[in-house]
A protein has these predicted regions:
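PLP-dependent amino-acid enzyme catalytic core
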Residues: 1-476
Length: 476
């Protein structure tokens, strides 16, 4: 449906008209810098930056109810730039024209209710938001859609020489970055990713290679790769694609917008369970809900439950003892969250202290709980990754310990697709998970192929089928 056809029915203008004043804002010293630059930390105090619209209050000329109507009706529009996360254009990067938006099918992922058996096991009815159904099969596509749309606009306006896009990754970021960069003209950009050697799944390694990126394997863990990338962004003209780049956070806020929309724009009774790695995602989710609250689109904030493995849980320890200390991680099946010094932790701390003080918690789960949860959830109609298993395990534990009340509604963020982590499932079935994970396969969750003769009667007997009763009635 065209904007004109829908507007005639809706009696409200659905196209973006907002005139923003976009800046980088330092979360440390508070200084602002024009957004038409490639900045990742404050030039004055080196603190992290966030993207801010200094004309945000102009959006309040519409009521919260009117904004809800706009966002709901835009789903029916046949406008490519508004099909993905930029449906919420005014709340993402409103200075980027729709013509510069890069849309590869990201966003609007399903919210799937747990069936009765799974809800009973978890301790409450809950939903899984399956971000593994994004184009590169992870939530990182949300941030890449905003970052690469920003870059596409930057290239058109500034006309720079070839830009090198770079990221450190545990697998999902590299896949998304390489995919979205590959959509831009080859003469305009180059794509490079740094991965910790031997610490990503074969599927995740294959994705950036398939998209044509230069893949550099580095000894160590993600934190080692990130240090190198930070040095490169400080000293060379490159475009950072990790969540330290605030324009990436803008796109990841869309997760919060979609959850609110899918839950009927009422979230004050909702708890969102989020696996935490580099902490960019939980930062974006909290910022997204704050934006909705500021415009009256929602009337209250949800609870946010961060979840971390006991092999990489600096945020959970901070929440428990009130002191943050980076840690050396141990191997985790939740590889995308195996990060001992989350880059975005300062943002998390600020958001919790200012907005989510009594609405944020972070819980630690074991590797055993993560794997058992993933295996069980996927036996009940879902396709969650190990991080999704981590989120559900965290919700189950929080319910059992009374850290969240059972009377509310619950959403678990499955950040990636099961198939990216199929190797962990296979190793669980075979009882061959590496000793460092500390996971023992539970017989009731193990499933292996069964060999039978190529004979219908033999297979029927093996399956315990009973012969069908013959109908003795007559016919014409």
């Amino acid at each position: 449906m065209t904007p004109q056809e829908l507007a005639a029915i809706a009696t409200i203008d659905l196209m973006p008209r907002h005139e923003p004043r976009m800046v980088y804002r330092c979360i440390g010293c508070g200084k602002s810098f024009e957004l038409e630059r490639l900045l990742y930390t404050c030039p004055h105090c080196r603190a992290l930056l966030r993207v801010e619209d200094e004309n945000f209050d102009a959006l309040k000329s519409r009521s919260g109810a009117q904004w809800r109507k706009v966002f709901d009706l835009r789903r029916a529009l046949d406008v490519e730039g508004l099909k993905g996360i930029f449906l919420f254009h005014e709340l993402i990067l409103p200075h980027v024209p729709l013509a510069d938006v890069v849309y590869l099918g990201e966003g609007h992922t399903p919210l799937v209710r747990a069936n009765r058996d799974l809800a009973q096991w978890a301790g409450a009815d809950f939903f899984v938001k399956n971000d593994g159904q994004n184009p590169s099969a992870s939530f990182k596509d949300r941030g890449m859609a905003s970052a690469i749309s920003f870059l596409n606009h930057y290239i058109r306006v500034k006309k720079p020489e070839t830009i090198l896009g770079i990221c450190a990754s545990t697998g999902d970021t590299s896949a998304a970055a390489a995919l979205y960069l590959s959509y831009l003209p080859k003469g305009a950009v180059r794509s490079v990713v740094l991965l910790p050697k031997g610490k990503v799944t074969p599927q995740q390694l294959g994705q950036p290679l398939g998209s044509g990126a230069t893949v550099v394997e580095v000894p160590g863990v993600f934190d080692d790769c990130m240090k190198i990338v930070e040095q490169l962004t400080e000293n060379y003209e490159v475009f950072l694609l990790n969540s330290k780049n605030p324009v990436r956070i803008c796109g990841q806020k869309s997760f919060a917008f979609e959850v609110a929309q899918q839950m009927g724009w009422k979230v004050d009774d909702v708890t969102v369970a989020v696996p935490i790695g580099n902490a960019g995602n939980v930062t974006a989710i909290m910022e997204g809900f704050i934006d909705l609250l500021r415009l009256g689109i929602v009337e209250g904030l949800p609870r946010v439950l961060g979840v971390q493995s006991h092999h990489a849980n600096p945020v959970a320890i901070w929440k428990e003892i009130g002191r943050y200390t980076p840690m050396t991680v141990s191997p985790s099946v939740a590889q995308a969250a195996m990060i001992g010094n989350p880059v975005s932790f300062p943002k998390v701390k600020g958001l919790v202290e200012e907005h989510f003080r009594d609405r944020f918690d972070c819980i630690t789960v074991t590797e055993q709980e993560i794997m058992d949860s993933m295996m069980r959830v996927n036996r009940h109609g879902h396709v969650v990754c190990t991080q999704g298993g981590e989120a559900v395990a965290g919700l189950r534990k929080a319910l059992a310990e009374g850290r969240v009340a059972k009377g509310g509604r619950f959403v678990c963020d499955s950040t990636s697709h099961q198939l990216k982590f199929a190797g962990f499932q296979d190793a669980y079935f075979e009882g061959k998970l590496e000793e460092g994970y500390g996971v023992v396969s539970k017989p009731e969750l193990v499933n292996r192929p069964v060999s039978m003769a190529a004979d219908a009667a033999a297979i029927a007997a093996g399956l315990g089928l009973k012969p069908r009763k013959r109908c003795m009635c007559g016919g014409n």
